């Protein structure tokens, strides 16, 4: 028999092969160690243990998959049960390790978002900070990865997306009549006109604002646009990439006459992704997202703005010390963040107050209420003021969250709702220590979030894999086949009864929305005129508002710019409804103790009842000899119903936004009519057209239709949940009883894989216990360590 040869026709050398395997093992270990550089040694140990568990589990699954494929490869037909196993194994093998944790830094221009990111990643001036020039409204994502260089990918609008924006920009600038000098001055001072003019000039040069849509389509941009619509920048050092990136994400003043080609492309930028090499401070798997506070005039960028907010599991509302105690912009940011908790994946909201080193000591001492201790230095004043701000803003934020969210929502239990940070002091440490700037505290939060998610994900992954291996191994067993059909019939009837009860429980849960919806609709009907007046009337009249209002109409009731507060007529009109439904909506989609209004606890109770019944039937009917089957059913029920949570979260956003989407759809013709108005007193005539259109739609039941559409969305979710549960459980029971139903096929022996998987599953408890022990040791050491003193030279 010929000896086995490798693909190059040479015999493999055992010594060289061993050396290659050893080098590969060391390289993988080194890569894993590099990935965890951002964590302290105790947390690194926990992560490595979980990583090892996951890696070994994937290897066992891959070996099992290969054996199953080989055992059925030549068969004309594959039993349904085997197909199910193969598909589930493949899905688990290809499942991502951990979905990234997106942390939004959400704030207005100048709030200090970029400075904060620079401090967190320990790269001063890496992202351009807002000075005399302001940054673009594009989203910037910063993460660390396995790359060896610093890299930035600048994603541009597609040709179709730019054409859509170009059409709206030219409509905005189109004049059909001669204007008086006063009217022309007002036109030129209109913020929307200035923005549109500037964008066209940046792309096509001076004079572009006077050309029509067709002329600009034929015009050649000042800078060549890559056909891939992606610009990739790379550099060996952070400073080098920063210099290359700066022109793309910093927009210059409107009176700037420079000719740098990079500067001229910013109106086309959709978003930017920056990847750092493996970092000592930011772990791989965390994405910091710099999100501007107002959205964008371009539909795609604005849609991405909202979707990015909704996919973030953590939102830090960034506000500097001079703006946090008032101002509509700050309130708007908080409201948008709370809505993200309702409609998106957000589980944690915190206020990050920046520039906390700013303090005028004489003024502070004059306004300071008499305290127990006299202030001796600037440092003491800053620390006292920071603590006071933290207490005040925590109380205010908690009260605001309580009005909108369920009382047991996780964010309300957070130990830190407000952070007081100073990026400048982090670098200089003239007044505050590094710890007192709270930058390390934010890094610790990031690490803890990733570590907790890794633990949950790996535990779920190993448990799910163990369930599959249990059944795969039991397929080759022929014990208790005569009684199998009876066992499954009892379980199937029980499951059908429980599904009916679950459907009723979901219906009762969603019925809780009916009363607040009705009350909200009544309030909206009586208050919509006042709301509309507040949106349409400006304190300084129509000066500078004419084309801004036209932009609102061109975008179906929404206008977002880099400098003005976001305008959303549809959201404003439906706000009275949201004020009524928000607490109940949050209660429905929360996790916690089972109540009449919470959805997930009902699904958890359904899961528990099925698992208990399986255990009961197993004990009573002899499954003690086939514990693999019982354990598989219990594990698979968890996997099936666990997957429902993602489905529910995805539908939640559509349900929540159905009110504004309905109103926007009903007012579409009204907006289109108003956008066509030109000539004398066009602004007032546009307002009248909007008022008439809204009056007409309200009289015809606009708010009632919005209510019906939301209720229809809830009904669709209920139907989807029940159908998914029925289908999955039917498939699972058919698989478990496949031997008795004639679907049995002898498979390859996976006994060794099952034994290894059993060991890995037992290891979960040991790893969790080790992690708890390390955490306790770490907390003890932190308590025992002396607190840091202030920087030298700070006391009088």
Swiss-Prot record:
Tissues expressing this chain: Expressed in germinal center B-cell and in lymphomas derived from germinal center B-cell.
Give binding positions for GTP.
107-114
Q: Name one GO cellular component term.
A: cytosol
Outline the segment boundaries, as ranges, of region: Disordered.
1-35
Q: Where is the composition biased (Basic and acidic residues)?
A: 1-22
Major place of localization? nucleus
**Coiled-coil parts of chain:** 158-185, 745-775
- Stored Pfam families: Dynamin_N
TM stretches of this protein:
none
Its BP terms in the Gene Ontology are: cellular response to lipopolysaccharide; negative regulation of apoptotic process; regulation of nuclear cell cycle DNA replication
Location in the cell reads: Nucleus speckle
Q: What is the enzyme's main class?
A: hydrolase
Q: What does this protein do?
A: Nuclear GTPase found in germinal center B-cells, where it may inhibit function of the activation-induced cytidine deaminase AICDA. Reduces somatic hypermutation in B-cells which may enhance genome stability.
| UniProt name for this protein | Nuclear GTPase SLIP-GC
Which species is this UniProt entry from?
A: Homo sapiens (Human)
């Amino acid at each position: 028999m010929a000896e086995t040869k490798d693909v190059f026709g040479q015999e493999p050398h055992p010594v060289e092969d061993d050396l290659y395997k050893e080098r590969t093992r060391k390289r993988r270990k080194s890569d894993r160690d590099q990935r965890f550089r951002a964590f302290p040694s105790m947390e690194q140990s926990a992560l490595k243990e979980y990583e090892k568990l996951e890696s070994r589990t994937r290897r066992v699954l891959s070996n099992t998959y290969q054996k199953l494929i080989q055992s059925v490869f030549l068969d004309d037909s594959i039993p349904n049960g085997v197909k199910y196993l193969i598909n589930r194994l493949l899905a688990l093998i290809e499942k991502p390790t951990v979905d990234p944790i997106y942390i939004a830094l959400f704030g207005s221009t100048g709030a200090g978002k970029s400075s904060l990111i620079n401090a967190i990643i320990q790269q001063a001036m890496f992202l351009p900070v807002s000075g005399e020039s302001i940054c673009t409204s594009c989203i910037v994502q910063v993460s660390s990865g396995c790359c060896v260089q610093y890299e930035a990918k600048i994603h541009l609008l597609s040709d179709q997306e730019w054409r859509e924006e170009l059409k709206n920009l030219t409509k905005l600038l189109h004049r059909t009549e001669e204007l008086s000098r006063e009217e022309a001055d007002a036109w030129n001072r209109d913020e929307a006109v200035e923005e549109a003019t500037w964008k066209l000039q940046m792309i096509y040069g001076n004079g572009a604002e006077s050309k029509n849509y067709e002329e600009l389509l034929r015009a050649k941009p000042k800078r060549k646009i890559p056909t891939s619509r992606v610009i990739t920048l790379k550099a060996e050092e952070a400073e080098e990439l920063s210099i290359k990136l700066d022109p793309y994400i910093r927009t210059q003043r409107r009176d700037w006459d420079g000719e740098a080609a990079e500067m001229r492309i910013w109106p086309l930028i959709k978003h930017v992704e920056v990847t750092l090499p493996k970092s000592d401070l930011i772990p791989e798997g965390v994405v910091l997202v710099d999100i501007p506070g107002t959205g964008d005039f371009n539909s795609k960028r604005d849609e991405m703005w909202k979707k990015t907010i909704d996919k973030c599991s953590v939102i830090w509302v960034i506000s500097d010390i001079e703006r946090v105690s008032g101002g509509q912009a700050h309130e708007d940011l908080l409201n948008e963040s709370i809505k993200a908790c309702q409609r998106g994946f957000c589980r944690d909201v915190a206020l990050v107050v920046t520039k906390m080193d700013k303090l005028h000591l004489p003024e502070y001492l004059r306004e300071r209420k008499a305290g127990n201790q006299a202030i001796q230095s600037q440092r003491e004043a800053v620390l006292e003021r920071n603590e006071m701000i933290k207490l005040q803003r925590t109380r205010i934020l908690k009260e605001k969250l309580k009005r909108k969210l369920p009382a047991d929502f996780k964010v309300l239990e957070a130990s830190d709702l407000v952070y007081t940070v100073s990026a400048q002091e982090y670098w200089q440490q003239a007044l505050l220590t590094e710890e007192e700037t709270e930058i390390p505290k934010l890094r610790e939060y990031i690490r803890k979030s990733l570590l907790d998610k890794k633990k949950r994900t790996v535990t779920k992954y190993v448990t799910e894999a163990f369930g599959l291996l249990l059944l795969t191994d039991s397929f080759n067993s022929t014990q208790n086949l005569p009684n199998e059909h009876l066992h499954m019939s009892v379980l199937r009837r029980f499951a059908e009864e429980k599904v009916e009860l679950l459907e009723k429980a979901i219906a009762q849960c969603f019925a809780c929305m009916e009363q607040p919806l009705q009350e909200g609709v009544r309030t909206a009907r009586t208050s919509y005129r006042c709301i509309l007046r507040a949106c349409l009337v400006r304190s300084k009249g129509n000066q500078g508002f004419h084309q801004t209002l036209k932009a609102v109409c061109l975008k179906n009731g929404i206008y977002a710019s880099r400098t003005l507060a976001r305008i959303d007529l549809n959201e404003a009109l439906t706000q009275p409804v949201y004020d009524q439904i928000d607490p109940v909506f949050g209660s429905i989609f929360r996790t916690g103790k089972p109540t009449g209004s919470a959805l997930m606890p009902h699904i958890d109770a359904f899961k528990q009842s099925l698992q208990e019944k399986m255990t009961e039937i197993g004990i009573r009917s002899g499954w003690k000899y086939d514990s693999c089957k019982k354990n598989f059913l219990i594990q698979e029920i968890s996997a099936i119903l666990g997957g429902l949570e993602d489905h529910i979260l995805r539908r939640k956003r559509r349900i929540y936004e159905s009110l504004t989407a309905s109103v926007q759809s009903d007012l579409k013709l009204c907006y289109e009519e108003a956008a066509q108005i030109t000539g004398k007193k066009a602004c007032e005539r546009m307002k009248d057209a909007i008022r008439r259109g809204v009056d007409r739609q309200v009289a015809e039941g606009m708010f009632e239709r919005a209510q019906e559409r939301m209720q229809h969305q809830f009904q669709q979710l209920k139907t989807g949940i029940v159908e998914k549960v029925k289908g999955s459980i039917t498939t699972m029971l058919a698989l478990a009883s496949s031997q008795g139903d004639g679907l049995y096929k002898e498979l390859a022996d996976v006994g060794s894989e099952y034994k290894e998987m059993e060991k890995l599953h037992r290891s979960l408890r040991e790893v969790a216990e080790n992690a708890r022990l390390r955490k306790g040791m770490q907390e003890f050491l932190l308590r025992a360590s002396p607190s840091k003193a202030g920087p030298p030279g700070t006391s009088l």
